[in-house]
Structures are given as structure tokens and as C-alpha cells.
Regions:
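Conserved AdoMet
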Residues: 31-108
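Conserved Class I SAM-dependent methyltransferase catalytic core
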Residues: 235-298
């Protein structure tokens, strides 16, 4: 079978589920993974023939995609902040929007690092706490971006912690002489549990924040495949994770520390009220490139 034929047929098979451009992109991602082709190979090499030994793998993957399983789960990985992260249905697929939080957190963390660097080997490392870590994308990004940083990361799910701890960045850790995040099982909603942590320069989180009533506006590939516990909160108490994050911050973040947490764009102002009530007088809602409320920064 010609690659061009497969791309055309695969795109058509997914067009009832996705816009044509997205359907085509998904098929090309699959071909790149299985065949090692580029997204233009079928155009510049119209006679490119798919190895018969590879066809069963492509066809099996297409069957999963036709059931609207996210392509990231089918491939077993996704890109985040310039790195490849393993993902499976135990963890939320990292979104590009979360890269904005990481970008700004790295800027803040590097500012602390530069302030301390004149002390050389005696300098205190930048300490960062990641709550609701999921795939570990935030924790790993911070650990690999801020030299010598210490990054404990918390989640309640054993399966998620296994994915997070299993991310393969050993060579980058070694080349940068930095430290692997420490992945800890704990319930973020239980901020009083016995746990030795802190003090932290930053507390970061991408908690569940989508209200149950918002499900009707969401795609099937999210609702049927991504973990509900990482996405949804009850309509009658949608801010419960933010109250918990505020308590963790009160308990473990240093007085000079800064917190950053993703928010539900429709509940940003209410979320801001939670942190102000917890004693964080300085808050800011940061918008993304689509001008949507994306995350909150809070500090004393």
C-alpha cells in the first residue's frame, strides 16, 4: 500500500470525528511514529510504499483512533515544553496551555537561583512543590530547567505516580547535574496529613477544575479516555482543590514564596478570592494567547 493512499484513507476515516486538518495531522503523526516518515513524505515521494510488516501495526492503531482514543495514548507519548513525555490513560494528557505556567515559573525560579548562585556550593537549592502532578510534566520541566532544584511532586494515584516516575530523562539529568523529582503519594485534599516537606520557594499545581456541568461542552475523546479524577470537580464545590492548595501553601511555602496554579477560566475571580482569604494579598490572573484566564499567581 502506498503511503499517500494510507494518509488519504486514514484522514477520511477520522473526518467524522475531527475537523479534516486535525484528522490528517493525527494520521501523519501515526505514520511518523510507526514508519519514521515526515509529514510531507507522501507528497514528495508519491510512490513511497509502506512495508507490509508495518501495515498491521498501522491498521491496529487506526482502529483505536476510529474509536476516538486520543492519539497521544495510541502513540504512548506526547510533546511538552520541548520534551517527550510518556502518557497512558492513568494520566491527563499535558496541554500546551500548561507550558505557559511552566515558562513563567521557570523565570521566577531562575531569578531565585541567580540571587543565590554567588554563594556557590553553599547556596540553598531552589525548592518547588508540584501538587496533582499526574504525568509529572510540570515537576520534570522545572527540575530540568532550574539547576540543582529540588522538586517533590504529589499525587494520590499510584498509576499516575508510576508514569511520572518512569519518565526517561536520565541522560539530561546527568548532563545538567541536576536531580530527579521526588514523587510522593499523598491526598492533596488532606492538607493536615503527616508529611515532611518544605519550605518551598514555589508551589505549582494543575488541579482538577472542570465542573461536572461543563462535560456537555467537552469532546468524547477527553470524556471517554482521560481520567475523570484529574479533570472534574463537583458543581456544588468547584473550588475545593484551590482551598486545599492554599492550605498546602500556608503550611509549606516560605513567606517569600510564590504560588502558581491553573484555573477554570470561568472561576478565576472566585479562585482569586480563595487565595486572598488564605492571606495571599498579592494575586494576579494571567491570560493566555487566546485571552482566556489561564492561571493565578499568588504571594504575600
Amino acid at each position: 500500500m502506498l503511503l499517500a493512499e494510507f494518509v488519504k484513507a486514514g484522514t477520511k476515516a477520522l473526518e467524522s470525528l475531527y475537523p479534516q486538518k486535525e484528522a490528517r495531522s493525527i494520521v501523519l503523526m501515526l505514520c511518523e511514529e510507526v514508519l519514521g516518515t515526515e509529514n510531507y513524505t507522501h507528497i514528495v515521494e508519491p510512490e513511497f510504499k509502506i512495508d507490509d510488516k508495518k501495515l498491521p501495526e498501522l491498521e491496529a492503531a487506526m482502529e483505536r483512533l476510529k474509536k476516538m482514543e486520543p492519539v497521544q495514548y495510541v502513540l504512548g507519548h506526547t510533546e511538552f515544553y520541548g520534551r517527550t513525555f510518556k502518557v497512558d490513560p492513568a494520566v491527563l494528557i499535558p496541554r500546551p496551555e500548561t507550558e505557559l505556567l511552566c515558562r513563567d515559573a521557570i523565570k521566577l525560579g531562575m531569578r531565585v537561583y541567580r540571587m543565590r548562585s554567588p554563594y556557590g556550593k553553599n547556596a540553598e537549592p531552589v525548592r518547588i512543590l508540584d501538587l496533582c502532578t499526574g504525568s509529572g510534566c510540570i515537576a520534570w520541566t522545572m527540575a530540568l530547567s532550574i539547576p540543582g532544584s529540588r522538586v517533590p511532586a504529589v499525587d494520590i494515584s499510584d498509576a499516575a505516580l508510576e508514569v511520572a516516575a518512569g519518565q526517561d530523562f536520565a541522560s539530561e539529568l546527568k548532563s545538567k547535574e541536576t536531580f530527579k523529582p521526588e514523587f510522593i503519594k499523598a491526598d492533596v485534599l488532606d492538607s493536615e496529613q503527616e508529611i515532611e516537606l518544605g519550605p518551598f520557594d514555589m508551589v505549582l499545581s494543575n488541579p482538577p477544575y472542570i465542573m461536572e456541568s461543563e462535560k456537555e461542552d467537552m469532546r468524547r475523546n477527553v470524556l471517554e479516555y482521560e481520567p475523570e479524577s484529574a479533570l472534574f470537580v463537583p458543581d456544588d464545590d468547584p473550588l475545593l482543590f484551590y482551598r486545599a492548595i492554599a492550605r498546602w501553601s500556608q503550611r509549606f511555602m516560605s513567606p517569600e514564596g510564590v504560588g502558581l496554579s491553573e484555573v477554570n477560566e470561568s472561576l478565576a475571580r472566585q479562585t482569586e478570592t480563595v487565595f486572598k482569604a488564605a492571606g495571599y494579598a498579592h494575586t494576579e490572573i494571567v491570560r493566555d494567547l487566546s485571552d482566556k484566564n489561564r492561571y493565578i499567581i499568588y504571594h504575600k
